[in-house]
């Protein structure tokens, strides 16, 4: 019997990483993992470190030679994206990514490039290695753990969240999600009504419910995210009240006002939602998923309607806790 295989792709996007990651999500409906050599060293993943350090990366550019193997020059490995699939996507995804790169060049009048590697692994070997590498993480008062790690007895159930990272859109391991959870940890949300925009895996919605919000509305334009949110609600034994809603769609489907809004999404979407957040927010707005290079453009838009209460930064990612100015309606 042939052994089932798993395919692993590594990407480096020197420019506009958010746009490339959004394209990968739309093109594959697969979860992405952002990583670095330091992350792999922390997990003692010597095999993967050897593979990405010693392999000849493929390179595509809209300028110079369009495609080549890098034999001696290695790309900067501080940040790369990992995508895993049960199918070999080399013949479909890579050409699509090249076309996307060329379309960005045409639309943005700039040069773009990316690096990539791929390999195939036995499914059982990859799954076992993956489980050994994913460890629980503390985010503020929340203890985030995968289903194969039991919660320690000293951790309160109220602050324990079970998420399987590779099967979800947010797990607490990414800087943007962990900062959101830390900012939420310091808030008294009992009897407040809350909105989670771009709910993904539902991790922030679960945190809001565990903090005692009276009403929760969560939305995402991706139907797969809605499925993940509902699955993780069940996994964490979170019950929805008659006032709670999980909506497949944008904020335009939502009415009312909310004491707390959280949005862990890309900066371009955050900027486009300013008027919606002014309409929906009564008090506190937490924004995350903002790359440092996009922070000033976000602040320029939000300055008129919100004041900054707290700003956090971890590596290149920034999270903001904002207060709505009462003069803005």
Curated annotation (Swiss-Prot):
Q: Where does S-adenosyl-L-methionine bind?
A: 177, 198, 220, 264
Where is it localised?
A: Cytoplasm
Question: Which CDD domains does the record cross-reference, listed alphabetically?
Answer: AdoMet_MTases
Question: Tell me, what does this protein do in biology?
Answer: Methylates ribosomal protein L11.
GO-annotated cellular components: cytoplasm
EC number annotated for this UniProt entry: 2.1.1.-
As for family, the record states:
Belongs to the methyltransferase superfamily. PrmA family.
Official protein name in the record: Ribosomal protein L11 methyltransferase
GO annotation terms (biological process): methylation
Q: Which domain of life is it from?
A: Bacteria
Which Pfam families does this one have? PrmA
Keyword terms: Cytoplasm, Methyltransferase, S-adenosyl-L-methionine, Transferase
Q: Name one GO molecular function term.
A: protein-lysine N-methyltransferase activity
**Organism this protein belongs to:** Helicobacter acinonychis (strain Sheeba)
